[in-house]
Amino acid sequence: MLYLTRRVETPAQTTASVTLPVDMRVKSRIKVTLNDGRQAGLLLPRGLLLRDGDILSNENGDEFIKVIAADEAVSVVRCADPFMLAKACWHLGNRHVPLQIMPGELRYHHDHVLDDMLRQFGLDVDFAHLPFEPEAGAYASKSHAHNHDQEHSH
């Protein structure tokens, strides 16, 4: 079995790909089936959230596997009013709902109760099968980089 042990930060020619939903992209130890049918084991550092386009490699550095975010059942909220979108984010965040936040659009795992709540605020909510890339939040690794020199702790 192929064991994928690290995320490669520099682009590499991929040898295969793996399509995973977000619930599998947050796991550091899991068995997966590559898109070419081979079995692989993820043995990655804990706290790593795999993103669409990430490249994983084995210890030998001779396999480079591209991560593809699977289409998932999501609710999609589109709104041109930043205040209403912020209000939706607040209410969903208050319920600890993982959110994908984009300009004018939110996505979360489909939930008809949450859909109805947002519709009561006058927002349009649609159902779709799309890749789901939530904000890292609780999924975030303990180590991360900042582009400034301020000292602070997390």
Curated annotation (Swiss-Prot):
GO cellular component: cytoplasm
InterPro entries per the UniProt record, alphabetical: UreE, UreE_C_dom, UreE_N, UreE_N_sf
Location in or out of the cell: Cytoplasm
Keyword Disulfide bond: no
Main location (coarse class): cytoplasm
SMART domains in the record: UreE_N
Name of this protein: Urease accessory protein UreE
Organism: Escherichia coli O157:H7
Phylogenetic classification of the source organism: Bacteria, Pseudomonadati, Pseudomonadota, Gammaproteobacteria, Enterobacterales
Recorded name of the encoding gene: ureE1
